[in-house]
């Protein structure tokens, strides 16, 4: 992922200026990487090493979403809606 794209995502989902580690930012960055890797795997169906990486990223995102549910359900609902994810 390019630095400019990453910076744009961080600015969009940051809770305050300079925020790079909040769950919302991490989830948004993972979602972007997951979507990019999904497109790659549509073309390269036998790339099982990348598929494993994709599954690990999906699991990590799921963990962050579960954390967000426990901490603040409204923030969870907002990020789900903003990123157009399933519940």
From Swiss-Prot:
GO terms for molecular function: rRNA binding; structural constituent of ribosome. Keywords: Ribonucleoprotein, Ribosomal protein, RNA-binding, rRNA-binding. The keyword Ribonucleoprotein applies. It comes from the Bacteria. One of its GO terms (biological process) is translation. Part of the 30S ribosomal subunit. Forms a bridge to the 50S subunit in the 70S ribosome, contacting the 23S rRNA. Belongs to the universal ribosomal protein uS15 family. HAMAP family: Ribosomal_uS15_B. NCBIfam families: S15_bact. This is Small ribosomal subunit protein uS15.
